């Protein structure tokens, strides 16, 4: 039974795959596999044992169903994953999860999810920037009334209005490119972040794992990745969604019957504006995306709360982050895509 609106109404399938249970499971296996690979690179695990781990550390062998069965007994998700891997690995199972702590796996897998999400968000933003640039060029000589305080001011062009939107969106692209190396980061220094379980080569092991996975290497961590990184990510999404909402709110206002200077496209042969008032042509996509932008911003506050952990870690962040990172990511992409759709079909 579908419960969350993301299940059936909002968000693209690519984001749902990244943040789904299967997406999480696949990336955690990838991280566990990279751990054993790094040990093998350092001469701690034989090539034969790594070959076994490489073969079994895939979702078709260590299934999500089997991990869930074990978790029902252990009540610990990563211990369940470790047991399922060791079970499948046979004699090579000794090197599964070697020297790691749970959050080495969890936070590094989240780093992979963030990395993959940033790729999709950047693509959606670049698409919107291109559409906005087309509007600015097309309407560069379209004179319209400028307004301040909601009152008539002096003339501007619609092209200037779109150019202002474009410049703001370009700044978001710069911010994302600057922030990405700080956001897509893992950690592998074990319990409380000392690396003691890995011995003298702990930092080299961490570097090998994270570079192999395409993630940034932190200078220092506790038992978890610093949540300031996640705050920056969610803030970027909230800021970007706000810029989209500003564009959409302007279009909604210009589509008012008493203004009627610009508005969403409307398929007069198929689309229905109202079940009662046949003349209605409502800016429904702009309204839809504006509402979603509010939800994206709502995840900023819990992201800050999640950063306040006891000592070297606690688990109060975990349940909240299953919502904040996944939902904000999927909805931000939805807002970007719908804003581009509105601009493509807009009449002026």
Regions found by a protein language model. Give the residues of each.
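A helix-coil-helix interface module used to build multimeric assemblies
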Residues: 1-189, 195-196, 201-208, 217, ...
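A glycine-biased, small/acidic residue-tolerant capping/turn segment at secondary-structure junctions
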Residues: 47-50, 261-266, 337-348
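Long, amphipathic alpha-helical stalk/connector segments used for oligomerization, subunit docking
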Residues: 295-348
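Short amphipathic alpha-helical segments with heptad-repeat character
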Residues: 115-122, 126, 133, 163-166, ...
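Generic, well-ordered alpha-helical scaffold segments in large soluble proteins
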Residues: 34-38, 84, 88, 131, ...
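Conserved beta-strand/loop scaffold segments within soluble protein domains that form the structured core
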Residues: 162, 206-226, 233, 237-240
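Glycine-rich anion/phosphate-binding loop at the beta-strand->alpha-helix junction
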Residues: 172, 176, 190, 223-317
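Alpha-helical coiled-coil oligomerization motifs
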Residues: 133, 137-140, 181-184, 252, ...
């Amino acid at each position: 039974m579908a419960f969350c609106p993301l299940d059936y109404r909002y968000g693209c399938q690519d984001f749902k795959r990244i943040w789904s249970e299967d997406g999480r499971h696949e990336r955690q296996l990838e991280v566990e596999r990279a751990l054993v690979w790094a040990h093998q690179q350092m001469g701690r695990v034989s090539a034969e044992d790594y070959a076994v781990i490489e073969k079994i550390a895939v979702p078709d062998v260590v299934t999500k169903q089997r991990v869930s069965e074990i978790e029902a007994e252990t009540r610990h998700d990563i211990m369940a994953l470790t047991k399922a891997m060791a079970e499948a690995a046979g004699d090579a199972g000794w090197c599964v999860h070697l020297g790691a702590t749970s959050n080495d796996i969890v936070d590094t897998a989240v780093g992979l999810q963030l990395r993959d999400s940033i790729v999709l968000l950047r693509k959606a933003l670049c698409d919107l920037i291109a559409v906005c640039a087309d509007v600015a060029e097309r309407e560069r000589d379209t004179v319209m009334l400028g307004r301040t305080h909601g009152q008539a001011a002096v003339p501007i062009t619609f092209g200037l209005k779109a150019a202002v939107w474009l410049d703001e969106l370009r700044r978001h692209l710069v911010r994302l490119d600057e922030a990405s190396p700080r956001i897509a980061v893992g950690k592998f220094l074990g319990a409380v972040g000392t690396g003691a379980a890995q011995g003298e080569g702990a930092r080299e092991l961490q570097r090998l794992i994270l570079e192999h996975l395409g993630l940034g290497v932190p200078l220092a961590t506790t038992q978890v990745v610093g949540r300031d990184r996640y705050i920056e990510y969610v803030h970027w999404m909230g800021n970007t969604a706000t810029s989209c909402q500003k564009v959409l709110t302007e279009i909604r206002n210009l589509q008012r019957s008493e203004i009627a200077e610009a508005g969403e496209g409307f398929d007069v042969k198929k689309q229905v504006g109202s079940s009662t008032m046949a003349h209605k042509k409502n800016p429904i996509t702009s309204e839809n995306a504006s509402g979603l932008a509010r939800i994206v911003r709502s995840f900023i506050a819990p992201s800050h709360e999640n950063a306040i952990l006891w000592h070297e870690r606690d688990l109060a962040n975990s349940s909240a982050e299953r919502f904040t990172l996944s939902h904000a990511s999927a909805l931000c992409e939805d807002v970007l895509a719908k804003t581009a759709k509105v601009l493509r079909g807009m009449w002026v």
